[in-house]
Amino acid sequence: MNPRLAAAKALAAVLSGKASLNSSLPTQLDKVELRDRGLTQDLAFGTARWQPRLSALAAKLLQKPFKAADADVEALLLVGLYQLFYSRIPAHAAIGETVGCADKLKKPWAKGLLNAVLRNAQRDGEALLIELEHDPVVRTAHPRWLQKALKAAWPEQWEAICAANNAHPPMILRVNRRHQRRDQYLELLKTAGLEASACTFSQDGIVLAEPCDVRSLPGFAEGWISVQDEAAQLAADLLELAPGQRVLDACCAPGGKTCHLLEVQPQLSGVVAVDLEAKRLVRVRENLERLGLDAELIAADARETAQWWDGKPFQRILLDAPCSATGVIRRHPDIKLTRQLDDIAALATLQGELLDALWPTLQVGGMLVYATCSTLPTENTDVIEAFLARTSGARELDIAGQAGQPPAGIKQPHGRQLLAQQGGHDGFYYAKLIKIAAQDRGGAGVTS
């Protein structure tokens, strides 16, 4: 299959609200020649990254919008526009190859439309984009609801956040403390001809100058390192793990943090890792096996503790709560297409429900770290404020820096917010809570 058609089919599923790129793209990649898979991924992710801008340009060039049933043609047009303005593919090849894919859609009218619109874009597109620059949706390539939400939350930083969201993300590694010191592994990378440097905030983190195939990394198969963003690496040390503790990792997939907990403290009494869907735990199990680690994996709704909790308290809980993922848009640019404003309030409700449900499983004196990869206060500091207001036995702890560094991110009314940095960490939020008393049914705290 032509990589342009494969990318368009994956994007059409996203535009139709039927899938994310993570679920729709692998199916299409299987239909593409191995040598074309990199191009297919670039076309799919690149088009999603710039979709708000490309769709605005398409609207200027089209006489009328596409019908919902023609999402495949719309996606193919966007892929064509992406090639013209954001790739090194020669214009004649971008237009010719994209128009040629129209035959496979079995819509006779599509070929002429695509040819005309793409040629007009080649001639007039740059001028039209300049015309459209006054609209912040076009300028930032973010949907209006998100652009407004970021501006309201971060009036001084919102444009930098958008720019970071549109940049290609760095490849960041986490060194397995059980096998290597970071300085040792940096030397191994140097010997292998891979340029890299130590991360600022994570004492296990290494950022590569250029992404590479994991199979070229020394000791990857042996479990010496994993791929994980620096911001996500901070969770394990924030928990202040000690030997003999029982730890819950709630909403654990794909398991990067689960594994890091076990690397940081090999003498835990056990880790229970819960996720909603059994199929998501497959990846967790694969990561554990590669690293030679063990955890109890449970497929369940973490809120329904009666279904999975054995009644034995946890001394530490990591709640990596489901969220809008607005801090990792650069890694998942289709979030711009799949998320809506209404989702945020619903997610905040879910996050509060998870906190309420898991808090009784935490031992008095135990610690819970709440984490999201969102940059929106509604899902972060506001959720913690509401939880503290209704939970008398909970207190917030300050977040300190690691390895002699100041704490990452920006102090919030509750917790700390990391904003995505070009060439650095993703957007992330952390809050740290301690249980000073149990909660009776009337809501009062009782020590025990």
UniProtKB/Swiss-Prot annotation:
It comes from the Bacteria. Keywords: Cytoplasm, Methyltransferase, Ribosome biogenesis, RNA-binding, rRNA processing, S-adenosyl-L-methionine, Transferase. Its EC number is 2.1.1.176. PROSITE patterns: NOL1_NOP2_SUN, SAM_MT_RSMB_NOP. GO terms for biological process: regulation of DNA-templated transcription; rRNA base methylation. The active site is at residue 373. It is an enzyme of class 2 (transferase). Pfam families: Methyltr_RsmB-F, NusB, RsmF-B_ferredox. The keyword Secreted does not apply. It is found in: Cytoplasm. Specifically methylates the cytosine at position 967 (m5C967) of 16S rRNA. This is Ribosomal RNA small subunit methyltransferase B. The lineage of its organism: Bacteria, Pseudomonadati, Pseudomonadota, Gammaproteobacteria, Pseudomonadales.
